[in-house]
Amino acid sequence: MKLKFLLAIFAAAIPLAACVLETPSPAPSEVPPTAVSAPTLPVQSGTAAAGQPVKQFVDVGGARIAQYSSVPPMMIDTSAQYTAVIRTSLVNMDIELFAAMAPVTVNNFIFLANDGFYDGVIFHRVIPSFMIQSGDPLGQGTGGPGYKFQDEFVASLAFDQPGKLAMANSGPATNGSQFFVTTVPTPHLNGLHTIFGQIVQGQDVADAISLVQSGPGNRPVTPVIILGIDIAKNP
């Protein structure tokens, strides 16, 4: 679907003056996609399949979210090709996942997606000419899955074009569930955020989400929701 059509849906609610950035590309001083580091919630009891982390639902600020006891074990085939379809309340984004170059990150994303962790989660931070951020079950930028894992930086993966799927973090080795998709090249993020995918169809959707009217903290006034993430393994 063309970007022009998507933007027409929000024409009445998106005055140009609402754009956060005035320049066509982000400045190096722009605040990067962050996942505010919060105390890990204790997970002491719950259910788990054999070899899987224990899952427990906890109440946080009136929200009931899933928390896991540990990083999921490696379940993917790093020699295979994986794709993800992020179904949103607008339209879908199709993404190629880089399993061979960021195996831990892709494995984590697939685990959470298949477990329904992202279902109903909003894009809580959107910035025109920069990126859109999601993956926090609290919808505030402070939530996660209950664990953190290491970065995976690869020299051949860079923020050199729009559509990069990468992890938000609060510093080294603080990856969890929050991720972002870029809408322009963002080279100032190289070496700071793990890249683990690339949009292959639906860049206009990411662009449209970045342009919705937002309020304090770049939070959309009208929520844009992830309905689900479908994972496919291609031989």
Where are these regions (language model features)?
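Positively charged n-region of N-terminal signal peptides that target proteins for export
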Residues: 1-5
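Cyclophilin-like peptidyl-prolyl cis-trans isomerases
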Residues: 6-7, 15, 19-235
